[in-house]
Every structure is written in structure tokens, then in C-alpha cells.
């Protein structure tokens, strides 16, 4: 069937700001789909409120709208653009829910827009829990017994029938939001009340528990001709009860018998046909009772999902790209496999390696010790809590597991010092469980006992035990020949770990291994187990004899990615590395990407010329550098992870491109930076560096309270706090500093109360400096810059202060010897400007500033790194200021951490961001708030909590708002961490926790009342901006 030519213009909805349960995988799938559809001759309109994405780059779609993802703005875009079709399956749950709302409200019909990829009925059947159960019964497949309920009473009635525990799954929510496991009636009342509130349709499925069963997923694709292919099977190492996004997973499935697998395949094909997903991908989840083999269907996602991103990276089969092309009428057998160029997409991938994914968590950012449910603070349940993930490829499960563990950037012996009885308490589902299991295996706990405690399949436990036994043997039998070395390295053991076991240093072990000629070989991900030649260079390392990767003779550059997403190091850094790859490719260099994150555009097989899917450790990166012999490595774009490798790479003789390591060190070394600022005559707040807690207590009175305290060398404000007296400082040192593994020095800074903070992104070639963007923080000093709303250009900073900011930024860039990007943070009091810190690397604001001014900063930085100047790159305006305002607001996943009361402080907690653009700064702010899910009411009741709020109350009353003390309000403003804030989170109501936020929000509300809704594409905004 030829592609549909009756469709000319297609609208794609993105997934909005990154949050837990919906991360960079949708940027990856959306980017792939836009490229595929434009390549097939379609015009593409994209809408997404998230500026930190590749998909919102103005070059990608024909028209790009960075607007809030709600019905009003979508209708405005439909009216303006008149697309023929809407593809809803690439924007995660957000995109799917929005498409359904547009359909149900009759808006799609009004504008004559067709839903493609998945019809409304298929989406309803796949997402509506009751409809899905009925569909499964029709085709004779078992599901756990369950009932769709609309009230707590109905839920209690059903639970009494089937017995506890029961699982609660709210309808149409993301990453299991609002769901959970209830072990008794009191817990059910709590979980179900929350779930019913958070479900957009206020229903939830209460079902019998299959806790402890094995969990499997199949990625399935279907075309118009009813060809169905299974892309891969995925097995969850953690049993049922842990959300699949929070579970360690492995592909292909390892413990299914062939008969069980065939049964599952047949079921998956029947399901995709019954639900009616005519084109595209679906993810179907099954549970298997390990005792009886009983197989039940858990759920399906009739869209591209987190698992499909993982399946794409695991197999090399581009699910999102193929799904987009199937949606416009192609058949699977008409689409070639990019990797082999010989086989069509209707050939199921075959893989001759094992892939392991491990999630990355951020519990340390959200700290109540117990929530009201009695869940332990880091317990994993059916509600997803991880913020990122790492993937590794090996020839065996053991090798892939050990590579993935080191990709998390944590010591595999993280729990070595913990007492056995404490370790036994860590066997409930939590992020440390895999470390506890391995440590207990080292101490001789039998596999059967561990199985009873964890329900992790004995096969996986035996695999871990084999690694542990090999480590034990190694202590007394150091490797003596190549075979020994290959055996130990083939288990995924690092040089450092081998060194610890045999009593040698990492460098010595590396030298011994290389002297024997034992180096990794690189294998290729080819979708066909080496049956056909592969044309796309996508590689992983292993310790075997045959190398499948031959380096070319072209000049090449290695770009280091940022590893798993975490709070403080998000998709913004992936954005910067992808732009660098594209720029260097255009400039004629062969680009080599090294990264371990399966969710991102950087690890797409067609982003760089070569992709090494490897952990970002010094050993792994040096192996690649020695294999490829590049002209140099770029380590300043991927955040703190590659930056930490810069010193080791330089010591090993690797050339760092761009800003030299000496500049990075000078900016991060407190005393060196202080001396530099004094020499340049740039004011800094009073500050000291202490090497121990005792010294910190002695120095604090010299600097004077209040103090901003933090450990040196951290990202995302980890362990940063404002302390107001000696008692608070002592508590900080005992509770926050003492548990840190590395015990760095302690920075004590005078805290400037009431100062306006500015964030500046600049670009330097060593001669000239472009001050690309100056951003004003809405929240005052003391709130981490990554958690503050920002405006570009600034609204409330005097011109005299801005002149100083530009001048100081130029002086710092040139004095540090920056060749590339520089981020500087300032505090402004009146016209006085103080520098807080400078980071000679890509910052998390680079995508936002690039979109705001219409200049691709990361691309320019990469070209400067290989010797170009700003003049040569055609940059004429060194102080670009757009003739409109761009606002950025952050998203913090409070809802995922029951019991946590929202509060902003110096430690970063946001996972994502939204952007608003308008001629008026307050309307830009209003749009950014809407984009972040904060629906500020234009009228209604406001409740205030806290002292000294009379001025704000008067302003809100003057604006026509009624004040209330009760629970029935439309907006909550609480300047103290009151439990009512938690209730607002759970009821989905807007809330504000800072005085500045309340003031800005009121101004924004007043402007939004006056002016109607305006939507405009990024391309149109950029027409107005002065070209750099």
C-alpha cells in the first residue's frame, strides 16, 4: 500500500517537560518521527512546551510551537496551521491524553483533523482499564481479577471479596502515578483516594495482587496489512510489585522456556489485533506465576513508550521511526532496515548479546523518612520513581549487568561496610537491593534464602553468585595469562576492581593487561546476529578475540555524553552533545559518541558517525580513545560526568578539545577562583573553605551568618543549604555532610539576602566573548538556579548592573582561557554585582538560551573547540537581546514522593522545564507556568499561609480574588512548609511557595485577563530576533 498522499501536513504533540515516568525517551522518539515524516515528503508541525529537547529545534520541524500542552493552545495551533492529521502516539501519556481530549471535545472534527497511528477507539480500549479487561476476556486471555471503581467504597467492597494485598492502578495516568499496593483497608482508603483524584477520569482499577510473580514485556508492531512483528522480549529482574520503569530489566528474556515464550507471542499478536492498533508500536506486559506457570496479561500501552526506546536501542530497530511511517500508510515489508540495508522492517530482529537496563533514582533529593503510608522512604512500588536509566550491552548477562552497574557511577562495593543484619533489611524493593544481594552472596548467604526474601528468579541470583565467586578466587589467584585476563574481564570486572582484589592500583593493572595484549574488542549491533553486513556503526565492547570495528583514517573527534539522566544533569546536556556532533559532522570530522543512556537522541544509531554504547568511566573511555585514535575529546558538554574524567584523560595523554582542564580546575577550585576574581577586580560575597567540620565551625563566625554551605565539586546543588546560626550549621554537618562518601572540602559563603540572581551563558573563542543570554531569576538568592523560574532578557535589573555583568563575564572568560561555553552566576543588590560561581562548560540553560535568541550555542562551541573563531563562524552580535521575552519554569515531581511537602531551597529538585515566549514578560511567565502544569486561576479563592503576607493579600483582593481560610480554594500561597501544600499537590491545585512567585503570578494573571490567547511558532519569533 503506497503512503497516503491525501495527507500533506501532520501535527505531532510532544510530551512536555521531563518528569518521572516521562523522560528523554519521548524526545528521542519524537525527533526520529519528525525526521522520518519530513524525509517521506510530509510537512510537520510540532508542539511541545519543553525547550530542552532536540525535537523543538527550529531546524527539525517546518513549524515548531513551544506552547503549553492544553486544549486552548492546541486549538489555537490547529486553527492557525490547519494540519490534515494528528499523530498522538509519540508524546507519551501527555500526548495521548491531549489527543483524546481534542477528539472528545469535538475539536479535531471541527478542524477536519484525522487521528493517525492509533484511532480513538484503540486508545480507549488500551488505556481504559475496564475496556481492556473486557477485550482480554473476549479473546480468552487471563487478566488478574479486578474491578474498575469510581469510589473508595466500591474498592473496599471488591478488596474484601478477593482478599489483600490488592494493587491500585488509576486510569490514564503516567508511570503509575497515584497507584500503589494496599495491604489492608486503611492503606486502600489512602491509596485509592489519591488515585481517584489523580486519574483524569477519576476511576481506578483495583485488582488481585500478583506480587512476586515474574514480569515480562513484549514490544510489538503492526501495519495496515495486519503484519505483526515482535521486536524483542524484555524480562524484569525485579518481580511484580515494582513498576517496570523502576526495575532492572534484561533483553532478551532469559528465564522463559520456548513454550512459554511462544504462548506469550501468540497472546501479544491477538491483543494488538483485538485492541485495534492498526499501525505502530505497542508495549504489552505479562506476569507469570513461577510456581504454576499461569500467565496473565497486566496492561498495554498503545503508543511509543519508555520500553520501546529501550527496545530500539537494544535491537537497533528504530521503533518510533517505523511507527511514524506505518501511520502514513507504509507496510513493514516496504520499509528497509537501515542497519543491514538488505532486510525489510518485517524481519524480526535477532540479537546475539544481552542488554541490561538499570534505573537511576534521586531519593536523596526528597527526604521525609516515612510517608503517611508507612512505605520506607526509598521503597519501590507500582508508582514509578526513577529519574533516569543506564543501559549496557555484553555477550552474557553477567558482563552486561556489571557494565550497567558501573554505568550508574556508583561503586559496586557501595555497601561493603554495612553489617550483615542491616544488609538483610535492604532486601525489600529499593535502589540498593542489587548491591545488598551481591554483598550477601559474598558473605555466603544461600541463593534459596535470597530468592525467598526477594522473589528475584534463582537464575539471576546464580549469575550474580558466579561473579562473586570469581572475585573470591581472584584474591588468591591473580590473572597470569591472556586466558585468565579474558575470563575475568569477560565477567565485566573493571581494572580498578581487579586491582582492589589483588592489592594493586588501577594504572598498574591496566599496564599489566595491556602488556599481555588483552584489550577489548568491539562488536556491532546489527539486528540480525551477524547474518548480514551492518552499515550503521553502533558498537559495544567485550573481551573476545574477533574485533568487528575497524577505525577509519579520517580526522575524528570523540564527544562524551552525560550518562543516565539525574536531577542536576538532565536532557539539556544531551542536547548540547548532539548539537556538537551535528556541527562537527558538517565541518568534515568523523564524530564518535560515547554514552550509556538509552533514552536519548545522542544514542540514536544515526546521530554520530560512530556510537559506542559504553559506561562513562575512565577505563572504558581510554579503551575507545586508544582504539580510534581521535584528534581529541570533548568533555565539557555532557555535564559533570565527562568533566570528572577530564583530569584522568589529560594525565593519560589525551588531548582535550576546547576549554583546557586548567581552566575547569581554576573555576572549581575555590581558592584559585577567589584569587582570580581579586586579580580581575570582580567582587565576590565573603567566603571561606574548610577542610573539616571542626574548621567549618571555627570559620563560620568570621564570614558571618546567614551562610550558604555546600561541599566542593557538586552538581545540582547536592547537599547545599542556607544555615542561619551555629546550631543549624552543626545539624548540617552531622546530617548532610557526614554521610557523603568522598568527604570533600566545605564551602562557606555569606548569603546575600534579597539579592536578585542572574544566570549568564557566554561563548568565547579566546579572543572575543559573546554574552549570549542574561537570565533574571524570579525566586530570590537561596533557591537553586536550576529550580528558579527565569526571564530573558531581565526585567528588574538596572542597565548599570547589566553593563557590569557583561564586562565581568568577558573578563572571566578571557582570563580563564575558555574556548567554548561558560556559565556565570551573579547576585545583584541594587547596582552592585557579585560573582557567585563560574563554570567553563555547557550549562543546563544552553538549550533555553539557544531557543530564546535563535543561535545554536552548542554547535558554535563545538566548532570553537576545533579551532574556529566567532568571526569565522559569522557571529557579529556579541550582545544579542531578543525583542521579546522568554520565560522558563521548572517541573518538580512532588506527586511521586508521598509525604514530601513542597519547598524550594539551594538543593536542586526539578527534573524538567517549560518555556513561554511573548512580547510581554508577564504573559511569557504565564505561558511557562501553564506549560509546567501550574494552571494559575484568573479568578476565584486564594488561601494564604504564613506571617507578614498582608501586602500580598491586599494585592490579590484588589485584583478581585476572594481570600479563604478553608480547604475550598483555587490557589494556595504558603511561604512556610505547611502540610496543606501536600494536599494541594495531591488535589492537583496550583500552589506558590515564595513571595516573588506570588507577585509574578499575580502580574501574569492580570495580563492574561487583559489579552487573549496568542500562539506563534518559534520560526516566527526568530524572524524578529537580531541574527548573531
From Swiss-Prot:
InterPro entries: ATP-grasp, CarbamoylP_synth_lsu, CarbamoylP_synth_lsu_oligo, CarbamoylP_synth_lsu_oligo_sf, CbamoylP_synth_lsu-like_ATP-bd, CbamoylP_synth_lsu_CPSase_dom, MGS-like_dom, PreATP-grasp_dom_sf. Mg(2+) 1 binds at residues 285, 299. GO terms for biological process: 'de novo' UMP biosynthetic process; glutamine metabolic process; L-arginine biosynthetic process. Residues 550-933 are annotated as: Carbamoyl phosphate synthetic domain. Residues 133-328, 674-866 form the ATP-grasp domain. Pathway: Amino-acid biosynthesis; L-arginine biosynthesis; carbamoyl phosphate from bicarbonate: step 1/1; Pyrimidine metabolism; UMP biosynthesis via de novo pathway; (S)-dihydroorotate from bicarbonate: step 1/3. SUPFAM superfamilies: Carbamoyl phosphate synthetase, large subunit connection domain, Glutathione synthetase ATP-binding domain-like, PreATP-grasp domain. Residues 934-1028 form the MGS-like domain. Mn(2+) 4 binds at residues 837, 839. Residues 934-1028 are annotated as: Allosteric domain. It comes from the Bacteria. This is Carbamoyl phosphate synthase large chain. The lineage of its organism: Bacteria, Thermotogati, Deinococcota, Deinococci, Thermales. The gene is carB.
Amino acid at each position: 500500500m503506497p503512503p497516503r498522499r491525501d495527507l500533506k501536513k501532520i501535527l505531532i504533540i510532544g510530551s512536555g517537560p521531563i518528569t518521572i515516568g516521562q523522560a528523554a525517551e519521548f524526545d528521542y522518539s519524537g525527533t526520529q518521527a519528525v525526521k522520518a515524516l519530513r524525509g517521506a515528503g510530509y510537512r510537520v508541525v510540532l508542539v511541545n512546551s519543553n525547550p530542552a529537547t532536540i525535537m523543538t529545534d527550529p531546524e527539525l520541524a517546518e513549524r515548531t510551537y513551544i506552547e503549553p500542552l492544553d486544549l486552548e493552545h492546541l486549538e489555537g495551533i490547529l486553527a492557525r496551521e490547519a494540519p490534515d492529521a494528528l499523530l498522538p502516539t509519540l508524546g507519551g501519556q501527555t500526548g495521548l491524553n491531549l489527543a483524546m481530549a481534542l477528539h472528545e471535545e469535538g475539536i479535531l472534527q471541527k478542524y477536519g483533523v484525522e487521528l493517525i497511528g492509533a484511532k480513538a477507539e484503540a486508545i480507549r480500549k488500551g488505556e481504559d482499564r475496564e475496556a481492556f479487561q473486557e477485550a482480554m476476556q473476549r479473546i480468552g486471555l487471563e487478566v488478574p481479577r479486578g474491578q474498575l471503581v469510581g469510589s473508595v467504597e466500591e474498592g473496599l467492597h471488591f478488596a474484601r471479596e478477593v482478599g489483600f494485598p490488592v494493587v491500585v492502578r488509576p486510569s490514564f495516568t503516567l508511570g503509575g502515578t497515584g497507584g500503589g499496593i494496599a495491604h489492608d483497608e486503611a492503606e486502600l482508603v489512602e491509596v485509592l483516594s489519591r488515585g481517584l483524584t489523580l486519574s483524569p477520569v477519576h476511576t481506578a482499577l483495583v485488582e488481585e495482587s500478583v506480587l512476586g510473580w515474574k514480569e515480562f514485556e513484549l514490544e510489538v508492531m503492526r501495519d495496515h496489512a495486519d503484519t505483526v512483528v515482535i521486536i524483542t522480549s524484555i524480562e524484569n529482574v525485579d518481580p511484580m510489585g515494582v513498576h517496570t520503569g523502576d526495575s532492572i530489566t534484561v533483553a532478551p528474556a532469559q528465564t522463559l522456556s520456548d513454550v512459554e515464550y511462544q504462548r506469550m507471542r501468540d497472546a501479544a499478536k491477538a491483543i494488538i489485533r483485538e485492541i485495534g492498533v492498526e499501525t505502530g508500536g505497542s508495549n504489552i506486559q505479562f506476569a507469570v506465576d513461577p510456581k504454576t506457570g499461569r500467565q496473565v496479561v497486566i496492561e498495554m500501552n498503545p503508543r511509543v513508550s519508555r520500553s520501546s526506546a529501550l527496545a530500539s536501542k537494544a535491537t537497533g530497530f528504530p521503533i518510533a521511526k517505523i511507527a511514524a511511517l506505518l501511520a502514513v500508510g507504509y507496510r513493514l515489508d516496504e520499509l528497509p532496515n537501515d542497519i543491514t540495508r538488505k532486510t525489510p522492517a518485517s524481519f524480526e530482529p535477532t540479537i546475539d548479546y544481552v542488554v541490561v537496563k538499570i534505573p537511576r533514582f534521586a531519593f536523596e533529593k526528597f527526604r521525609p523518612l516515612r510517608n503517611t503510608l508507612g512505605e520506607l522512604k526509598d521503597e519501590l512500588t507500582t508508582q514509578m520513581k526513577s529519574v533516569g536509566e543506564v543501559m549496557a550491552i555484553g555477550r552474557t548477562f553477567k558482563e552486561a549487568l556489571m557494565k550497567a552497574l558501573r554505568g550508574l557511577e556508583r561503586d559496586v562495593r557501595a555497601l561493603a561496610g554495612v553489617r550483615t543484619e542491616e544488609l538483610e533489611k535492604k532486601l525489600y524493593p529499593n535502589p540498593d537491593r542489587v548491591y545488598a544481594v551481591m554483598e550477601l552472596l559474598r558473605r555466603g548467604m544461600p541463593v534459596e534464602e535470597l530468592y525467598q526474601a526477594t522473589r528475584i528468579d534463582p537464575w539471576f541470583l546464580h549469575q550474580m553468585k558466579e561473579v562473586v565467586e570469581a572475585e573470591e578466587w581472584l584474591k588468591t589467584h591473580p590473572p597470569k595469562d591472556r586466558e585468565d585476563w579474558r575470563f575475568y574481564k569477560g565477567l565485566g570486572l573493571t581494572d580498578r576492581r581487579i586491582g582492589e582484589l589483588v592489592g594493586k592500583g588501577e594504572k598498574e593493572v591496566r599496564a599489566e593487561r595491556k602488556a599481555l595484549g588483552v584489550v577489548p574488542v568491539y562488536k556491532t549491533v546489527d539486528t540480525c546476529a551477524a547474518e548480514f553486513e551492518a552499515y550503521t556503526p553502533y558498537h559495544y565492547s567485550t573481551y573476545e578475540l574477533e574485533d568487528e570495528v575497524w577505525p577509519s583514517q579520517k580526522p575524528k573527534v570523540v564527544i562524551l555524553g552525560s550518562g543516565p539522566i539525574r536531577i542536576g544533569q538532565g536532557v539539556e546536556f544531551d542536547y548540547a552533545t548532539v548539537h556538537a556532533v551535528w556541527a562537527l559532522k558538517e565541518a568534515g570530522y568523523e564524530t564518535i559518541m560515547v554514552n550509556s543512556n538509552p533514552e536519548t537522541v545522542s544514542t540514536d544509531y544515526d546521530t554520530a558517525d560512530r556510537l559506542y554504547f559504553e559506561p562513562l568511566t575512565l577505563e572504558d573511555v581510554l579503551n575507545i580513545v586508544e582504539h580510534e585514535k581521535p584528534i581529541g575529546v570533548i568533555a565539557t558538554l555532557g555535564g559533570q560526568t565527562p568533566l570528572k574524567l577530564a583530569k584522568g584523560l589529560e594525565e593519560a595523554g589525551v588531548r582535550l578539545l576546547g576549554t583546557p582542564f586548567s581552566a575547569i580546575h581554576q573555576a572549581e577550585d575555590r581558592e584559585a577562583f577567589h584569587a582570580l576574581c581579586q586579580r580581575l577586580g570582580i567582587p565576590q560575597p565573603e567566603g571561606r573553605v574548610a577542610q573539616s567540620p571542626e574548621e567549618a565551625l571555627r570559620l563560620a563566625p568570621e564570614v558571618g551568618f546567614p551562610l550558604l554551605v555546600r561541599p566542593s565539586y557538586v552538581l545540582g546543588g547536592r547537599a547545599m543549604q542556607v544555615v542561619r546560626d551555629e546550631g543549624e550549621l552543626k545539624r548540617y554537618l552531622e546530617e548532610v555532610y557526614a554521610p557523603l562518601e568522598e568527604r570533600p572540602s566545605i564551602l562557606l559563603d555569606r548569603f546575600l539576602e534579597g539579592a536578585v540572581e542572574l544566570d549568564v551563558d557566554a561563548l568565547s573563542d579566546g579572543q572575543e566573548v559573546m554574552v549570549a543570554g542574561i537570565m533574571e531569576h524570579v525566586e530570590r538568592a537561596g533557591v537553586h538556579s536550576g529550580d528558579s523560574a527565569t526571564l530573558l532578557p531581565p526585567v528588574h535589573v538596572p542597565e548599570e548592573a547589566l553593563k557590569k555583568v557583561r564586562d565581568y563575564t568577558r573578563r572571566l572568560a578571557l582570563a580563564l582561557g575558555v574556548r567554548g561555553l561558560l556559565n556565570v552566576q551573579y547576585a545583584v543588590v541594587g547596582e552592585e554585582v557579585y560573582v557567585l560561581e563560574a563554570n567553563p562548560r555547557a550549562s543546563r540553560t544552553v538549550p533555553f538560551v539557544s531557543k530564546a535568541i535563535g543561535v545554536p550555542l552548542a554547535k558554535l562551541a563545538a566548532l570553537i573547540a576545533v579551532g574556529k573563531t566567532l568571526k569565522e563562524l559569522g557571529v557579529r552580535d556579541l550582545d544579542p537581546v531578543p525583542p521579546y521575552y522568554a520565560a522558563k519554569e521548572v517541573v518538580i515531581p512532588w506527586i511521586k514522593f508521598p509525604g514530601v511537602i513542597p519547598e524550594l531551597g539551594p538543593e536542586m529538585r526539578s527534573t524538567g522545564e517549560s518555556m513561554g515566549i511573548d512580547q510581554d514578560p508577564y504573559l511569557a511567565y504565564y505561558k511557562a507556568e501553564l506549560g509546567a502544569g501550574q494552571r494559575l486561576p484568573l479568578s476565584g479563592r486564594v488561601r494564604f499561609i504564613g506571617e507578614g503576607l498582608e501586602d500580598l493579600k491586599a494585592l490579590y483582593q484588589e485584583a478581585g480574588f476572594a481570600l479563604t481560610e478553608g480547604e475550598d480554594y483555587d490557589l494556595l500561597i504558603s511561604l512556610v512548609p505547611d502540610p496543606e501544600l501536600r494536599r494541594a499537590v495531591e488535589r492537583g491545585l496550583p500552589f506558590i511557595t515564595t513571595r516573588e512567585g506570588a507577585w509574578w503570578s499575580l502580574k501574569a494573571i492580570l495580563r492574561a485577563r487583559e489579552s487573549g490567547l496568542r500562539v506563534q511558532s518559534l520560526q516566527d519569533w526568530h524572524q524578529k530576533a537580531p541574527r548573531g
